[in-house]
Amino acid sequence: MAKVLVLYYSTYGHLETMANAVAEGARAAGATVDVKRVPETAPDEVAKAAHFKLDQAAPVATIADLEHYDAIIVGAPTRFGRIASQMAAFLDQAGGLWFRGALNGKVGAAFTSTATQHGGQETTLFSIITNLLHFGMVIVGLPYSHQGQMSMSEIVGGAPYGATTLAAGDGSRQPSEIDLAGARHQGELVAKTAAKLFG
């Protein structure tokens, strides 16, 4: 049975919701799944003034956690077309794991959220995936077997590189059922891939 970590950072709760959907998909494929978040690095007064969602149920991950999983699915929102600094700061601490090759051959995947349709979803996914490739991980995206990402009847997230959602500039849009279905599908694919590689 594959052991999967869904590792995320969420400012306003959109990625927390997506992370839980990713985990549902991985569990449905038979994996053992943990959902953990990275530490908030913004000062408390800044986070509170900006109404960050600070009461998230997931425990905070440590770098030492990462090597104990067969697959790691990383989610972070965009910041100007790239990975949010909180996740970047966390992954930047993984040099020791990289040096030892501790993540080589493990399965990796990415998911994200942006405020708008053209707010950097794919570039943010690539910035996450770049880290995972440097760690030596095998990448699983979100193929068009998730047909919801091809919808033209409504605004939807999703890309071949990973599950996505849109939050709107004021955070008012929550992940749609199509967005969540994409997240579940990606979680399922990661779990199935890890099971093939690790049993």
Curated annotation (Swiss-Prot):
Name of the featured protein: NAD(P)H dehydrogenase (quinone)
Keywords (A to Z) from UniProt: Flavoprotein, FMN, NAD, NADP, Nucleotide-binding, Oxidoreductase
PROSITE patterns for this protein: FLAVODOXIN_LIKE
Ligand binding (FMN): 10-15, 78-80, 113-119, 134
A Gene Ontology term for the protein's cellular component: membrane
Binding-site residues for NAD(+), renumbered to this chain: Y12
Superkingdom, natural source: Bacteria
Cofactor note text: Binds 1 FMN per monomer.
Reaction(s) this enzyme catalyzes, per UniProt: a quinone + NADH + H(+) = a quinol + NAD(+); a quinone + NADPH + H(+) = a quinol + NADP(+)
HAMAP family tied to this protein: NQOR
Name of the top EC class for this enzyme: oxidoreductase
Family: Belongs to the WrbA family.
Pfam families: FMN_red
Binding residues for substrate: W98
Listed InterPro entries: Flavodoxin/NO_synth, Flavoprotein-like_sf, Flavoprotein_WrbA-like, FMN_Rdtase-like_dom, NQO
EC id: 1.6.5.2
Chain ranges of the Flavodoxin-like domain: 4-190
GO terms assigned for molecular function: flavin adenine dinucleotide binding; FMN binding; NAD binding; NADH:ubiquinone reductase (non-electrogenic) activity; NADP binding; NADPH dehydrogenase (quinone) activity
Keyword Amino-acid biosynthesis part of the UniProt annotation: no
Cofactor(s) needed for function: FMN
Keyword NAD: yes
